């Protein structure tokens, strides 16, 4: 008998978005890092073997081919349903028996001159594993160079076009502990500052324009007590200011002076962080952090100097949220207020942090992988055309930036019903600065939870909800007729003589009882299935 799926996985499949991948690449060796070029359709992948691959793809052709095959598959499904060969038409991407997107079974077999995807170059870049890879973000040379680090304690700079190494530095001489290892890289958007985090919690800074000098530019000792999980630049504040995550704390550092502030102990591992789309290059005030206990927390530098979280969004209690990234799309209000996150159950969630809820779910992995029960999502990126790129240790997927029109219409209807329900509860519920959760039942049962934490951005959303107050009242009016039924129930159970008069009213309310039917589960109620299971899946061997 197979292992029973968690409630969160079942709910995710029911609430699944109709968006499908356009490309899927499978890896025989564990994939440790991947990056998408900021302005071109180029992918970079680093493996546990130390190999680095650079691939390019034709996004337009992949989109067209995927859409064409999907329409063909949908037509065949409708015909089979009409002929009675299948009980229903399957509209789920993950549960479909046929995949209509382009699939590469082995990344090593991608040709050098392929029509849809090709290999630009490949190389054995590091001895041991390649732990992290990033593209250069400097305005005058954006994407022209790549930086990689490995367990060989070497950071290498190479040309994106050719893969040829143009600079490298051995950082082992700058370690306080010779057994220390590199974990993460980060590059300044405006200056040639290349930051590297270590397992002992230090931050080392080098001049990316002159790596061969092997000269350490700055060093921040013990930014954290444990391994650096993430480094995030703060270009709107200063080229010298960065945020770091390690163990259970968030730190604000100045690479020249050291730690500015370090947060309170969150008693939960902090794994990744990002700014919202509208704050990536401006203000850098709001920070969203993913946790090992399946939630996203919201922080504000202007509120408390990033000393503690202000509010939270519960995403998946049975998994760790291993990675998070901004949608990078500020053209649409919903997307601008959203971030993508990936969890250890292979699920992708789009969180609207101002509404405090999960608004879209995709399934990166639904089957057992080579290196675990499922392909845990540990890598997220956004490609040059705002497509989501998700990856685990087995598979990388590029998702379409278009949605199936027929399914989209149905989703819009569901969202309208769902949003009306949210409006009535939010207006009558707790203050905007209380604990934000994707489960409204959680809000109702814990009205005072985190009541001392607040977030100014949520207030605008509440004002919009109040404008639709009348609609929510109209929807809730029929429920008031159930009061007579409650009296009836009380009268039936109570045997005292003074309730005899109520017993005489039985015929009238018994007719109304027919109107009180058990409704079908709404998308909102299905989403609440996610909160009925506990547990954390920790990293192993990464």
Swiss-Prot record:
Cellular component annotations (GO), alphabetically ordered: nucleolus
GO biological process terms held by the UniProt record: positive regulation of transcription by RNA polymerase I; ribosomal large subunit biogenesis; rRNA processing
Positions with biased composition (Basic and acidic residues): 462-471, 530-542
Keyword Repeat among record annotations: yes
Ranges of compositional bias, category Acidic residues: 403-425, 438-461, 497-506
Location (main, coarse): nucleus
InterPro entries reported for this sequence: WD40/YVTN_repeat-like_dom_sf, WD40_repeat_dom_sf
Biased composition (Low complexity): 426-437
Disulfide bonds: none
WD repeats: 125-170, 177-216, 265-309, 372-409
Region annotation (Disordered) ranges: 400-542
Family to which the UniProt record says this protein belongs: Belongs to the WD repeat WDR55 family.
Protein name, entry field: WD repeat-containing protein JIP5
């Amino acid at each position: 008998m197979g292992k029973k799926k968690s409630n969160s996985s079942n709910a995710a499949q029911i609430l699944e978005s109709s968006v499908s991948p356009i490309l899927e690449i499978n890896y025989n060796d564990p994939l440790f890092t991947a990056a998408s070029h900021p302005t071109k359709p180029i992918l970079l992948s680093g493996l546990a073997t130390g190999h680095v691959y650079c691939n390019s793809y034709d996004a337009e052709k992949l989109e067209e081919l995927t859409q064409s095959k999907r329409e063909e598959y949908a037509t065949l499904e409708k015909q089979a349903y009409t002929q009675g060969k299948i009980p229903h038409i399957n509209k789920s991407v993950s549960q479909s028996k046929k995949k209509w997107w382009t699939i590469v079974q082995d990344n090593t077999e991608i040709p050098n001159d392929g029509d849809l995807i090709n290999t630009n170059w490949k190389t054995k870049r590091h001895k041991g594993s390649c732990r992290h890879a990033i593209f250069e973000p400097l305005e005058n040379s954006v994407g022209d160079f790549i930086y990689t680090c490995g367990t060989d304690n070497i950071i290498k700079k190479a040309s994106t076009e050719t893969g040829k190494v143009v600079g490298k530095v051995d950082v082992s001489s700058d370690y306080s502990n010779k057994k220390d290892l590199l974990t993460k890289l980060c590059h300044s958007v405006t200056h040639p500052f290349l930051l590297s985090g270590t397992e002992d919690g230090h931050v080392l800074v080098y001049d990316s324009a002159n790596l061969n000098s092997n000269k350490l530019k700055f060093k921040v000792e013990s930014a954290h007590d444990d391994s650096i999980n993430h480094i995030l630049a703060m270009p709107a504040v200063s080229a010298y200011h960065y945020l770091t995550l390690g163990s259970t704390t968030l730190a604000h550092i100045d690479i020249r002076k050291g730690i500015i502030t370090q947060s309170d102990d969150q008693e939960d591992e902090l794994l990744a962080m990002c700014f919202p789309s509208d704050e990536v290059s401006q203000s850098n005030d709001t920070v969203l952090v993913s946790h090992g206990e399946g939630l996203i927390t919201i922080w504000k530098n202007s509120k408390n100097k990033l000393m503690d979280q202000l509010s939270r969004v519960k995403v998946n209690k049975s998994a760790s949220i291993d990675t998070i990234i901004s949608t990078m799309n500020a053209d649409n209000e919903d997307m601008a207020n959203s971030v993508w996150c990936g969890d250890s159950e292979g699920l992708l969630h789009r969180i609207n942090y101002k509404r405090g809820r999960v608004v879209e779910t995709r399934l990166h992995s639904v089957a057992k992988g080579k290196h675990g029960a499922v392909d845990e999502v540990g890598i997220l990126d956004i490609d040059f055309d705002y497509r989501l790129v998700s990856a685990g240790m087995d598979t990388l997927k590029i998702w379409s930036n278009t949605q199936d029109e027929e399914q989209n219409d149905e989703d819009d209807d569901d969202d309208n019903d769902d949003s009306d329900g949210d409006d009535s509860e939010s207006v009558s519920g707790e203050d905007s600065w209380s604990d934000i959760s994707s489960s409204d039942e959680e809000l109702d049962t814990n009205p005072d939870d985190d009541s001392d934490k607040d977030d100014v951005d949520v207030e605008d959303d509440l004002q919009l909800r109040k404008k639709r107050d009348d609609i929510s009242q109209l929807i809730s009016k029929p429920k008031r007729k159930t009061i007579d039924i409650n009296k009836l129930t009380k009268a039936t159970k109570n045997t005292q003589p003074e309730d005899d008069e109520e017993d005489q009213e039985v015929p009238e309310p018994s007719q109304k009882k027919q109107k009180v039917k058990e409704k079908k589960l709404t998308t909102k109620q299905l989403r609440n299935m996610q909160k009925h299971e506990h547990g954390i899946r920790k990293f192993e061997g990464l």
